[in-house]
Amino acid sequence: MALNVSKVVPNSPILVKSVNASRSRRVLLAYVHHPLAANKGSSIEELKQGLCCTKTVTFVSSRRCSTLCFVGKSQDTETNSQVVQKEGEKQVMPRRKSSNSSQLLVEYVSNDAKFVNERARNDFVLLSRGIMRLDARARQDVAILGSGFLKLDARAREDTEKIDRDVKRKAERLHHIATIFKNIAESKLKNAADKHWSDGALEADLRRADFRAKQRAMEDALMALEFIKNIHDMMVNKMVDSLVTSETGTTDRISLEKNGIALGFFPGEVSSDRISAIEEAYKSMASALSEADGIDYTDPEELELLVTTLIDLDAMDGKSSASLLAECSSSPDVNTRKALANALAAAPSMWTLGNAGMGALQRLAEDSNPAIAAAASRAINALKKQWEVEEGDSLRFMMNFERPNDDDDVDSDLDEI
């Protein structure tokens, strides 16, 4: 009979069996020297009887490794180191030295360390395989996500193209519907016009439009007559004032000097030649009023004469003058706007132009015609430079009293303001 020794690893599906005679002998020796066997005084015969039982004896070590002893027949009886005699004979068991027990312990510890090392190596292999599986799974998930994003992008592109096609199709449909409505409206309007013409209402509309045009022409003629009347009244007042001054023998005049040089900012006297020219212009305008429905402002010479007269009479801020300047500055005729720009550019100062004249110049400076805009801009810059005062300049307002009868001796009293 012999002992078969096997190791049982906890939580391990594999039971490793070893049939080794020397190992069986060591286990048996350890059992013989067990303290319990020594205290009870067990004999070799009792040990034999104990070994012949079919129960399992378990020894648990401190390293969680169990050793199971099974009783059974030995496959190789020649390798047994124990000899069991027959019944009635004494059983002889040799004593082992202490060196054998220490060697047994060393071998046991070495085998246990090898087992632990092998187990750790297997655990590392399993861990490495698990990490590799996780890495492969992560790569697979990333690939799945990438393919999902690509599918979403392709789906978005398809949806965008579909929406674009739908919008274009709807726009074409709306354009087609609008064209149909336009054709229907044109046909209905044509039918209504034909019906209106057949009923005689269109002729009434034409008469009404002609009446409104004549009414507008009469209003323009009335405005022109009032304008001419105002200018005529101003000329008469100017001539009366000149006659009064000639009777008294003195004329007072305000002048402005800059650095000792007189500036012609203020209007002076109107000469007899200018008055006669204005009277001829009035007569021509009056004859034109009898033939036409208003003053012909498209004549550049006539317009320049009117504006120059208003400047000389210091009447640029009047109601009729302001309406004339506004109408001529926004006229569609290029020659009219150009003549107005030239006439306003001939003004001696901003003082004589007034708000109406400067407003007309600013509108002409923004004209679409480059020549008109350049002329108006130059006039504005020239007028602004007259009032620029640099360091060291001096401006003086002078009141000059003159006697027109004295040609040789001119006595003037200058009062500085």
Curated annotation (Swiss-Prot):
What is the reported phenotype of gene knockout? Delayed age-dependent and darkness-induced senescence. Increased resistance to oxidative stress.
What residues does the transit peptide encompass? 1-36
The superkingdom of the source organism is Eukaryota
- Summarize the record's induction comment: Induced by abscisic acid (ABA), salicylate (SA), methyl jasmonate (MeJA) and ethylene.
Alphabetized, the UniProt keywords read:
Chloroplast, Plastid, Transit peptide
Q: Where is it located?
A: Plastid, Chloroplast
Spell out the note in the miscellaneous section. Answer: Plants overexpressing AAF exhibit increased root growth, elevated level of cellular reactive oxygen species (ROS), enhanced sensitivity to oxidative stress, and early leaf senescence induced by continuous darkness and by age-dependent signaling.
Per the record, the similarity remark reads: Belongs to the ATA15/OSA15 family.
Query: What is the protein name for this chain?
Result: Senescence-associated protein AAF, chloroplastic
Organism of origin: Arabidopsis thaliana (Mouse-ear cress)
